[in-house]
Structures are given as structure tokens and as C-alpha cells.
Amino acid sequence: MTSAEIREAFLRYFETQGHTRVASSSLVPANDPTLLFTNAGMNQFKDCFLGLEKRDYVRATTSQKCVRAGGKHNDLDNVGYTARHHTFFEMLGNFSFGDYFKRDALKFAWEFLTSEQWLALPKDKLYVTVYHTDDEAYDIWNKEIGLAPERIIRIGDNKGEKYASDNFWAMGDTGPCGPCSEIFFDHGEHIWGGLPGSPEEDGDRFIEIWNNVFMQFNRTADGVLHPLPAPSVDTGMGLERISAVLQHVNSNYDIDLFQHLLKAAANIIGIEDEGQPSLRVVADHARSCCFLIADGVNPSNEGRGYVLRRIIRRAVRHGNKLGATGTFFYKMLQPLIEVMGQAYPELEARREVIEATLIREEEQFAKTLEQGLKLLEGELAQLKDKTIPGATVFKLYDTYGFPTDLTADIARERGFIIDEAGFEVEMAAQRQRARDAGKFAVDYNNIVKVEGETQFDGYTNTTGQGQIVAIYKDGVQVDEVSEGDEALIVLNQTPFYAESGGQIGDTGIFKNETGIFEVQDTKKSGGAFVHQGIVTVGNLKTSQNVEAIVKADIREATARNHSATHLLHAALRQILGSHVQQKGSLVASDILRFDFANDQPVSFEQLQQVERLVNAEIIANTAVTTELLDIETAKAKGAMMLFGEKYGDEVRVLSMGSVIDEKNFSIELCGGIHVKRTGDIGLFKITSEGGVAAGVRRIEAVTGTKALEVVQKADHDIQHINSLLKAQKDQTVERVQANVELVSALQKQIEQLNQKLANFQAADLIDQVQTIAGRQTLITTVQGVDAKALRNLHDSVKSKLENAVIVLAGVEGDKVSLLASVASQYTANLKAGDIIKHLATELGGKGGGKPDLAQGGAPLNEKFGQVMAALPAWLEQK
């Protein structure tokens, strides 16, 4: 069976067992700030397991895209060198949300693996493990399925504390947890390795292929396990591992899917040996990079984007080691589509964006390598011994993406070594930062635990009645809050919109006969709407009814900006192209911010075109309509869907703008608050455009009265400029241009005069040359010159003293500019950078540079004269 056939067989089997086939979620976790990447099949069902979300089904099956290349789960450094480590993999899974439990889960797994109708694995090749106290699972395997006792292995707490075991799973220190049962396949005696729990368990003979997790308990802070009223099941089987078993190979890289990618990589690079670790790196990383970009991740210097950039650069580096030249990595997308495109159509749909992103990153990495080489050469020139400091190696690696093995190779060629211990210290600190970044944010779900969902009735209302179902103060659930208390309050129904899709949460008040609560923000926790604020009058208690009143003016302004964001998105796609995809947004009452994929800055002319398009739709004053559709109908209608967003089976489709070919100007999935007609937006005005990351641009804009204020301020500024220039309104540009040209001409004259002055000063300074340590040396202080004038003076002196040491200090106001140069025949023993560092350190400033030329600066203080006077003696020692 091929990998694709195995994937389909798994999903089809569980469909026959009453499971709903659910599409893989994005690699960017939806609504989970604690997770860097989706790394398990259960991630998209987390709220179901926590009881925070109800779905139309209680049984599900998926083939989930997963990435493990950052934070807690990081396989990056092992990829290419082992048989089973990957940055990207597929996790086949079946899930029960309070429906079936251990008996059915284990029987399903056994039937699928061993039945002649399905995978038909030899039963004598399979072993299982259970948690050492899980007699229920043991008996199911032994008495009901018929597995011999010698094939059932009990695993205890083997990780240093109670319930810390390979066979006990926990979502965290507290919360859902339970035992698990793993299924292992025996690859045969010809491969080294022992059974689970044995000293040789890390070998490759017995390989785990399926893990059945039984969420049976809730662990409280005191460590006590309490049985869950409706236990659940979470299982996972790696597609690559089971494919290796069924295709009778011992390495995942030998399965059909990887063989196709390895052959393609070898052909692209131009080599014949397909077994090299570096080729495996290229093949593996092509999968993670292409899927991450398809799911909306862009290379950057932080968070998810930083991990993606590291993976791309690692792949390119390994390709270069094999002899690849030019941009090559993007060519791996086509063979990937050939083997995975049918299961994951987003690869083809995002082909243009994926290829453009990979090409840009390869080209940028080439420039980075060039910059890194220059930096390394500069560091080598200034070293006093033969060891490159670990901090320097880390700076090259972390800031410039310069591979450490390349640094070591270059150092070795020049007779240097790298400080590996120092580098590891820096790396340890970096790994801690990565772990901290992997936490991202506090998980709101850890504070708010509410059964059921808040009913939202705010699409057409800004007031409503609701009952208080939960109150939280200082992270603890309470029954009552009083005046001055900051709290989180959950209602059974609310007109307050909770922050989502870039739109900020509503503000306003709750009130009843006992108190008033000022709502400062509204957020979601699972299905609950959480109102954050402070009690301003009296007190409020659980079960009380309150009148909920949203600030209507803020809501209306926010709605204008949200609808304008949709029109902006559609206009950008018309003007710039269909590659434009939303990467992020902020919709507040006073501003809208829209981040989108685009390689180039948007020109002023293009921005004007966008403004005209959006305002034309506003003037048309068409109705804004919403309808609830199933996801497939919404797709057929052409609704824009955001990569990384989590959509249910039924979605809210928002349409607005003029209709062309039976399609509205803008059609998007959106759960936010919007205007009733486009004319309600009033006016749209872009205020800024710029870059926020590689391949991502940001537009900020305002609407309504805010837009009018911007236009009127621009008119006021032009009027003020005209009055200063004594110009008529139609003469503004002409007069400004004339003044710019005049200023430019005067600046050139000033520069020419400064150069003449520098030449005169240089002639006078030659008389101050002295001999120090056998070298012609000029040390002088010049008053009233800044750094630029000091450079002009230096160049004039240098033209008259070619083989000398020159140290100049320019004093202007309360600042000192420093400049030093050393003739090339002296740099072996005396470096300009050392001179400047010495002076800057003594004066409390900063500076440095190359051996032959360096600059710095410092505040002017009482030590200045003394430090300059002592410099000849310091130079005498060099």
C-alpha cells in the first residue's frame, strides 16, 4: 500500500465505525496561545476534551498535519540523521468525546491493524504496553482481544515522579489526564533493540506505531486524580511509521512518499547518491516549509516565522553542501504536490506564494552569508589569540543565520578554532528564550472554566438582559464582587462582542439594583464570553440578572472600520493581485490595521487606486448581507477564507459591495460586527503603508469622522505651507520644489566651503605631528566640528600623511566625536579600533571599527583633557 492509500484506509475504516471525517486543522493553532505549532491530532479538539466546546459529533477521525521544530517538541537537529525524526509528519487519529472508551478504542485499533480487510499485520509481530495500574486495559488486551501475557508489558512511573510515565498522559500539571496503551511492531531480530521497558528499548527493532490515550481523570492541584464523568479517547498513529511497516522498510525515508522527494531533490541538485543525510534534510524540510507557508506563516525573526526561517536556511545549507547552486529549494514544491497535493489541495492553491517566499528567503540567505563572512573576517583580524569567542559564533548564527559548522570550517582554514563551550552557553540561553516564546501568552482557559456557551445576541442589539453564571477575581472563582474589585464576569447571554478576527471586544456596563460593573474588554474562553472590568458601584453576585449595555458609539465606529477592512482586502486583491492574503488585522474604534502578503511596498499611485475603489463602494451605498452556509457552499460561492482560522461546519458569510458577474465586490467568512450599508462607513482614508516582516505589508486607515479629520488636517497643513511660501494654492508644489532645489544647492556650497576649511586646517595640523613608538603620529582636538566635518578633516590630513597614525577629537556642544586611522604597515601591532575603544571607554562612550579606521563618540566631561593628554603614553606601549 502507498502512503496515500494507508491514509485513506484509516479514515475510511473509522467512518465505518461511526466517526466523522474532520479535515486537518492549520499548522497555526487556532485560539490556543500556548502552542507554537500544531503538533498532535488532538490540538484542534482541545476545547472538546476540556468540555468548553460541543460539536455535532462525538466521534471523529483525522489525518493531521503536524510540525515539531520549536519549543518543547523540537526534532530539528536530529532530522536527516535518524530513521524516524521529522520536522513535518502526519498523525492519523480517532477521537471519542465522552462516547466510547477503552474497550472500543483498543478493539478498533486491533481490528484495523490485523484484519485481512484492512492492514493485515501479523499478530505475532505486535506487542502492547499499558500503565502498570491499568488492569482494565490489560484485561481487554488479554481476555477480550486474546493477546498473550508475554506480549502485554506494564510500564510504571519511569520519569522520576508519580504519574510521570511513558504510559501516562497529561495535558498539564492539572486538568485532564490518564493512562495510555501503546502498540509496537517488531521489525525483526536482524535489527538491534529491546522491548519497551528494557535497557535496549531505544533500539530500532520494536517501534511504537499507535498510542491510545484514555482521558480518564481530572488531576487537581494537590495531585489527586478524580474520575471524569465522561471519559474520552485520543489516539495517534504516525503515517510515516505505519507506512514503513507496511512497505517492509526500516526507515521512514525509504517509504514511497520520501523516495519520491529524495529522487526529486537529487535530480534538482544534480547528484546520484540518494542516501546522504543532507538530501534527507532537504526532502524533510521541503514538507514543513511548504505546508507552513501554505498555512500562512511567513519567515521572520521571531516566533513561528523565526522557526520557519531556520528550517529554510538549514535546508539551503545542506543543499549547498551537496553542490546546489543558485535558488533550488523552491523547486521541491512540485514533487511535493505530486505526492501530497490530492490530500492537501492548499499546496496547489498557494503555489505562487510558497514559491515566491522560498525564492526570496534563499536570495536573502545568500546575502546573509556574504554579510556574515565580512563580519567573521573582521573579527578574525582583531583577535589576539586563535580562539573565536562563543559570543561571536552565536551572533553569527543567531543574528545572521550563519551556520556554526561553516564558521568552524572557515576558522580551521585560517588556523583558528571556535569556543564551543562559550557557544553552548549562548545557545542554552537562546533555547530558554525559545521555550519562553513557545508559551506565547497566558492561557485564558486556565482561569475560566464554564460549562455551556454564552448566547451572543449583539449582531442587531447593543443592549440586552443576561444572568451572571460565573465571576472570577484574582484568578479564582467567587460568588460575589464589590465596589473597587477587578473581575471577570460570564453571562448566559450578552450583546457584548468578544474579541475575535482582529476586532476588539466591546466595552460598556452591566447594571442592576445592587451594583454597576464597567466592562473594559470582552474576550472568549471556549464558548464563554468573558467580560473583564471593575465594579464601580455596589456589588454583583452569581445568578443575578443584569442589564448589559454596550457603548453604542464605540461599537458603531468599530463596525465602520471592520466593514472597511473587508473592502480594503478586496480592493488590494484587485489592484495588486490574487496573491494578497490577510496576515493579521486590528479593528478598533479609532483605526483599522491590515497586514497582508506582498513582496513589494505598495506605491503611492496604487494606494490611491485602492482608496478610490473603496470609496466608490462606500458611495454606492449597497446593502451588507450575512447568511449562514455550510462550509462547502461558502467555498463554492467564492468566500475568502483566512489561512490558520478555525471554521465550523456552518459559517457566517458576509457579502458587500457592487455585484459583477453575480459576485459581490467582497465575500468573506466573518463573525464580526458590521455596518448595514456600505454608505454607513462615510469615508475611507489610508494613513500609512509599510513593512512589518519579510513579504508582509501593513496598511493603517481611518473611516468616518476620523477620515474627515485627516483630510481636513492635510488641507490645513497645505494652507499653512502656502502662507509660509507666500504662494497661491495651485503654486504649492512648484514653490516647494524651487525651495528644495535652492537648499540642495546651498548645501553643496557649504560642503565645498567645509572641504576648503578642512584643507586649511589640515595644513596647520601637520606641524603637530610627533613620533611615538617609531610611528608618525598626529593627536589633536578640533573645536566646533561634528562627526561629518571630522571625517572631512581626517581625509584632508590623510592625503598629506599617508603613513601615519591619526587620532582626531571633534568637540561640539556637550559631545565629542572620535576618529582614528592607522597606516597598514602598523596594524599588526596597533589597531584603530583599539584606539577608539580605549578612548571611548575612558570617556564613558562607545566606538570601534576596523584595524585601519574606526569611529566613536562620548559625552564631553572633565576627564576629556586628561584622557587626550595621556594618549601618547598609551600609544608608546603598543
From Swiss-Prot:
Keyword Signal among record annotations: no
Keyword tRNA-binding in record: yes
EC number: 6.1.1.7
Location(s), subcellular: Cytoplasm
Pfam families linked: DHHA1, tRNA-synt_2c, tRNA_SAD
Family annotation (InterPro entries): aa-tRNA-synth_II/BPL/LPL (IPR045864), Ala-tRNA-lgiase_IIc (IPR002318), Ala-tRNA-ligase_IIc_anticod-bd (IPR018162), Ala-tRNA-synth_IIc_core (IPR018165), Ala-tRNA-synth_IIc_N (IPR018164), Ala-tRNA_ligase (IPR050058), Ala_tRNA_ligase_euk/bac (IPR023033), DHHA1_dom (IPR003156)
Major subcellular site: cytoplasm
Family to which the UniProt record says this protein belongs: Belongs to the class-II aminoacyl-tRNA synthetase family.
NCBIfam families associated with the record: alaS
UniProt protein name: Alanine--tRNA ligase
Species of provenance: Acinetobacter baumannii (strain ATCC 17978 / DSM 105126 / CIP 53.77 / LMG 1025 / NCDC KC755 / 5377)
Lineage: Bacteria, Pseudomonadati, Pseudomonadota, Gammaproteobacteria, Moraxellales
Gene that encodes the chain: alaS
